[in-house]
């Protein structure tokens, strides 16, 4: 199985509409939903023939728990305080124990939100924060405590071989994406044992090295190598896109500090790539 996934559903009405359009033409089969975002048209969403997943969010917008219960995670107005780096530093600081307890509170709130939808537990996270070892371990604990039978969890530890073998793509690799890939691979090594112990299904992942540049030519060059690895491991593949771009003048309910990502022309590129794939999954 190849999952073609769009993240960040719920950023804005317009962004959601663009993701829905990709799904409606058969270019997507998985959409990850922000628990603290918006779902502009629930009836339309229910008509889409896709798998929906919970896009756990610990970095942007308002938390689902009371601000007074999670002061390390959220400010007095309930807005998340930290980036990925901030959460990681907090997880290895002297405040680790307090942070873990508050993290558990917020993760329970987000899992409970998803329980009410009645949808299968297909789990990933905004900016891949669940790969921080303390977050990963706490998430698995919450799932166990709440007796949640998770169907799938994203494990964004990309194989490096497909990218090493594509010499023609070397000039296009962004240094920031190389760093992200290395960090997530390292964190993947730390989380590997817990993942195996949990028994939750995952898939071979693509979407870090080409983040912001998931165009047709790049994806097609590395996908044959991905298929070989997946066949050898008897694994599914998950390919991540961010087609929910926004235009200037459109409003998001989230923080301005992240808005440059949503207005980025790179997201429009990924939207266009999926439109080229019309009907590919039908």
Identify the function of each model-found stretch.
Residues 128:
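Divalent-metal (often Zn2+) His-rich catalytic cores of metallo-beta-lactamase-fold enzymes
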Residues 125:
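Active-site histidine-anchored catalytic micro-motif
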């Amino acid at each position: 199985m190849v999952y073609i996934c769009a993240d960040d559903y719920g950023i804005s009405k317009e962004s959601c509409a663009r993701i829905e359009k990709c799904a409606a033409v058969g270019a997507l089969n998985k959409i990850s939903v922000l628990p603290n975002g918006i779902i502009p048209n629930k009836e339309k969403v229910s008509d889409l023939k896709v798998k929906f997943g919970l896009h756990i969010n610990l970095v942007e917008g308002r938390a689902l728990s009371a601000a007074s219960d999670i002061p390390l995670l959220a400010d007095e107005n309930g807005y998340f305080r930290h980036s990925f780096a901030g959460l990681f530093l907090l997880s290895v600081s002297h405040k680790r124990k307090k942070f873990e307890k508050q993290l558990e509170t917020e993760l329970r709130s987000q899992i409970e939100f998803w329980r009410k939808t009645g949808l299968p537990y297909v789990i990933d996270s905004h900016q891949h924060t669940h790969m921080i070892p303390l977050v990963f371990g706490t998430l698995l604990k919450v799932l166990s405590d709440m007796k949640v039978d998770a169907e799938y969890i994203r494990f964004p530890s990309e194989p490096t071989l497909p990218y090493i073998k594509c010499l023609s793509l070397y000039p296009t690799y962004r240094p920031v994406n190389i760093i992200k890939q290395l960090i997530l691979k390292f964190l993947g090594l730390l989380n590997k044992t817990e993942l195996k112990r949990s028994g939750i299904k995952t898939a071979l992942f693509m979407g870090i090295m080409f983040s912001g540049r998931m165009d047709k030519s790049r994806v097609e060059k590395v996908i044959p190598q991905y298929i070989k690895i997946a066949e050898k491991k008897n694994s599914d593949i998950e390919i991540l896109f961010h087609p929910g771009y926004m235009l200037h003048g459109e409003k998001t309910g989230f923080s301005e500090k992240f808005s440059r990502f949503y207005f980025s022309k790179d997201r429009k590129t990924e939207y266009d790539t999926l439109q080229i794939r019309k009907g590919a999954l039908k």
